[in-house]
């Protein structure tokens, strides 16, 4: 198991990044709005403005660290599977392939030095076995995330349901780029309350990047991690005993 330990440790370190991401997101989502209030006596109105705070850059950075650490763990696994195949110095192309279509030549190139029985396991884990649903496969998602992060920061934005204004009539509402503004009667100023719904952070490609849109929530990062930890790594443990 000692050869597997390095890859397993890398994957375990990815979990550290994921836990860090959860903490950073939790801190932000606990108070996602800037709320400002002002009176306009001449209009006999009290205005409240709700605007999303900028998402800290640490959030997409940590998400990228998680993805690359997890992907690196799979490549280290492939390298060690070549080492136990009596290949002292595996070829630089040796890595854990992830393909959405039937293996092209690139699959063989990446797995040429790997123990043949292990290659069969790797092939069985490929996203293309899900047919048209390959984009739902955790490994495809991981690969897509790494391809995005390799070239740019993840685009991130906040989404939430409608903030409810309670106890008073709201005769005025105006949408803003990152929030909204409401106006209530000045006499209702001390009575107004609000309820903020659950807010989520969406990760994806920047809007100006060519290709299909790609967006996920943090729950998908957890799904990807659990798949690698619970369904990929155990498939190879027998090779290292």
Residue ranges and their predicted role:
Residues 1-241:
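Acidic, Ser/Thr/Gly/Pro-rich intrinsically disordered interaction regions
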